[in-house]
Amino acid sequence: MKIALIGYGKMGRMIEQIALERGHEIVSIIDVDNIEDFDSPAFASADVAIEFTNPTAAFANYQRAFAHNVKVV
């Protein structure tokens, strides 16, 4: 599965490690320093995005992902 990570703190890194161990591909990593990457072809190619930020940022992140037809959990 192609996965985009939204939030790359301690939990984001842990999710990346587990996903890779299980044979998934990380196609995009979005963090506060590269919000513009929501518009990248790599992000749009994801089968799913895993959002692990904070409640304040989460809603906007969901909207950005949905704008590219990427499902979010």
Question: Model regions: which residues?
Answer:
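Short beta->alpha connector loops
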Residues: 9, 34, 53-56
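Rossmann-fold NAD(P) dinucleotide-binding segment
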Residues: 40-48, 52-73
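NAD(P)-binding Rossmann-fold cofactor-contacting core
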Residues: 14, 18-39
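Short, hydrophobic beta-strand segments that form beta-sheet elements in well-ordered domains
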Residues: 5, 25-32, 49-52
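A structural micro-motif
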Residues: 1, 24-25, 70
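Glycine-rich adenosine-cofactor-binding loop
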Residues: 2-15
